[in-house]
């Protein structure tokens, strides 16, 4: 493969990477903790919304609410990571991508 072909391949990969990054920014995943907490985030792991069921809000038990929120965020983050790995996997040739 000559240098010109390598350069062209690199440009194509960069263009595809940018397209996938935009796709991830627009994609959403939901993480849940039971039916009480739902966290929505995009493929870049940016939280877009948190929904809390009123029945889980107990002023005398804030710790449970906090634990549920953490669990829902962790679930959503894991799903966002899986989505990114799925979309970016073909470009990485099966390598684990740092930060995803």
Swiss-Prot record:
One of its GO terms (cellular component) is bacterial nucleoid. GO terms for molecular function: DNA binding. Pfam families: YbaB_DNA_bd. Disulfide bonds: none annotated. InterPro entries: YbaB-like_sf, YbaB/EbfC. It comes from the Bacteria. Its main location: cytoplasm. Coiled coil: none annotated. SUPFAM superfamilies: YbaB-like. Keywords: Cytoplasm, DNA-binding. It is found in: Cytoplasm, Nucleoid. NCBIfam families: DNA_YbaB_EbfC. Binds to DNA and alters its conformation. May be involved in regulation of gene expression, nucleoid organization and DNA protection. PANTHER family: NUCLEOID-ASSOCIATED PROTEIN YBAB. Belongs to the YbaB/EbfC family. Homodimer. This is Nucleoid-associated protein Rcas_2292. The lineage of its organism: Bacteria, Bacillati, Chloroflexota, Chloroflexia, Chloroflexales.
